[in-house]
Amino acid sequence: MASQGTKRSYEQMETGGERQNATEIRASVGRMIGGIGRFYIQMCTELKLSDYEGRLIQNSITIERMVLSAFDERRNKYLEEHPSAGKDPKKTGGPIYRRIDGKWIRELILYDKEEIRRIWRQANNGEDATAGLTHMMIWHSNLNDATYQRTRALVRTGMDPRMCSLMQGSTLPRRSGAAGAAVKGVGTMVMELIRMIKRGINDRNFWRGENGRRTRIAYERMCNILKGKFQTAAQRAMMDQVRESRNPGNAEIEDLIFLARSALILRGSVAHKSCLPACVYGLAVASGHDFEREGYSLVGIDPFRLLQNSQVFSLIRPNENPAHKSQLVWMACHSAAFEDLRVSSFIRGKKVVPRGQLSTRGVQIASNENMETMDSSTLELRSRYWAIRTRSGGNTNQQRASAGQISVQPTFSVQRNLPFERATVMAAFTGNTEGRTSDMRTEIIRIMESARPEDVSFQGRGVFELSDEKATSPIVPSFDMSNEGSYFFGDNAEEYDN
């Protein structure tokens, strides 16, 4: 990590603030959440949504997407300069679902972006409140992480589909700032860098001229973000090599892929935040909750509390299982797509099943789907316990570089042991250790080989009763260690296609 002095907590990243004490952080995160809630209430009034319709997660997503699109400066500028048929660059909209005569009706709405921006600023004391926008982006990203697999994107960049647990935040827009960078997985950063290097290989002007200078700065910044996620000196030294390369090419791509593989055992630090749909915040504000006064944290008990007493609905397709839809959204709310299923199940108090066994498609409904057969049901988003979200990779003892769980990027700071067959993963590292990074590669492989499967991650950390808001008495669960529960294995989910 960066030196202690420059390290900001997630909440500071989230609210763009400088160093603050815990109370100030809780207040500024609360202010951000309250702003989202007030905006949502105002939009429901504008759209004349009934209470039930306002609690529909599909309506929430449409409203969130509208405000994100209204503030997307780059795309707005692009749309104005490249007018495409049938797209008004000044308008934004989407499907709103209404309940009419016992049936769900889809209505496509269109709003002036300027009007949406006005409502958003008004809800946020006249400010642009970028932090709130980023928060909604992270919620959408967490939902995508739980819904789609990125096998195709991995294969396209020359990575292995088994690296899917490194892909948190792979659908976050570039403009998501420090808070966005904190939640991106190692694989996501590697993929962004490889795409950049490939463009440089194919387009000789990519690194040249005034634009090239900006590109180079962006490249080095991304390298530093990735370097900060690694926890061993050898991995970081290798990142320095990649960053300082005069003319990044295939050697750098090789190094990055090696690093991504190594991150399957030597886990990177990736932040996890519980970002909830806007309608949940709207409900709380409407019921008189003052987020700024009470304070709020994205990594503590608060989101669990909020979900305990919020009723959110979802449209359900004819052959979908409402319990499975609930699991999908629960995982998205807690950013738990890459968590060990045993840990998630324990916290949720219901069995959380791998994605390949879910009878549910994504939450969003395509415009060509038939509304006649749509039903709706309540999402069960409550939990049995709560646990603190982590930003570490869950490697065993932090003093000496060591291993974390393979195929899992932990979300919750809860003790678990590491059931892994090191041999299967080490097989990925046979062969190439020559070249400029050979000594680092050798060192990384040595660290991985010395990792002991019987080690325990998050030693002594447990879950808490929902009545235990100060986290005083941890309950350390014991898991059946015969198998590690990855959500992704044996998977047949749809691909994410933008």
From Swiss-Prot:
Q: Which GO terms describe its cellular component?
A: helical viral capsid; host cell; host cell nucleus; ribonucleoprotein complex; viral nucleocapsid
Tell me which UniProt keywords the record has, alphabetically: Capsid protein, Helical capsid protein, Host nucleus, Host-virus interaction, Ribonucleoprotein, RNA-binding, Viral nucleoprotein, Viral penetration into host nucleus, Virion, Virus entry into host cell
The cellular location(s) given in this protein's UniProt record come to: Virion; Host nucleus
A single GO molecular-function term is: RNA binding
Which post-translational modifications are recorded for this protein? Late in virus-infected cells, may be cleaved from a 56-kDa protein to a 53-kDa protein by a cellular caspase. This cleavage might be a marker for the onset of apoptosis in infected cells or have a specific function in virus host interaction.
Keyword RNA-binding recorded: yes
The main location class comes to virion
UniProt short sequence motif Bipartite nuclear localization signal, positions renumbered to this chain: 198-216
Q: What domain of life does the native source organism fall in?
A: Viruses
Q: Where is this motif: Unconventional nuclear localization signal?
A: 1-18
The record's region (Disordered) falls at: 1-21
Task: Please give a single GO biological process term from the UniProt record.
Answer: viral penetration into host nucleus
Claim: Disulfide bond is one of the keywords in the record = no
Pfam families referenced in this protein's UniProt entry, alphabetically: Flu_NP
Report the family membership: Belongs to the influenza viruses nucleoprotein family.
Description of how the protein assembles with itself and partners: Homomultimerizes to form the nucleocapsid. May bind host exportin-1/XPO1. Binds to viral genomic RNA. Protein-RNA contacts are mediated by a combination of electrostatic interactions between positively charged residues and the phosphate backbone and planar interactions between aromatic side chains and bases.
Q: What is the protein's known function? A: Encapsidates the negative strand viral RNA, protecting it from nucleases. The encapsidated genomic RNA is termed the ribonucleoprotein (RNP) and serves as template for transcription and replication. The RNP needs to be localized in the host nucleus to start an infectious cycle, but is too large to diffuse through the nuclear pore complex. NP comprises at least 2 nuclear localization signals that are responsible for the active RNP import into the nucleus through cellular importin alpha/beta pathway.
Q: What is this protein called?
A: Nucleoprotein
Gene that specifies this protein: NP
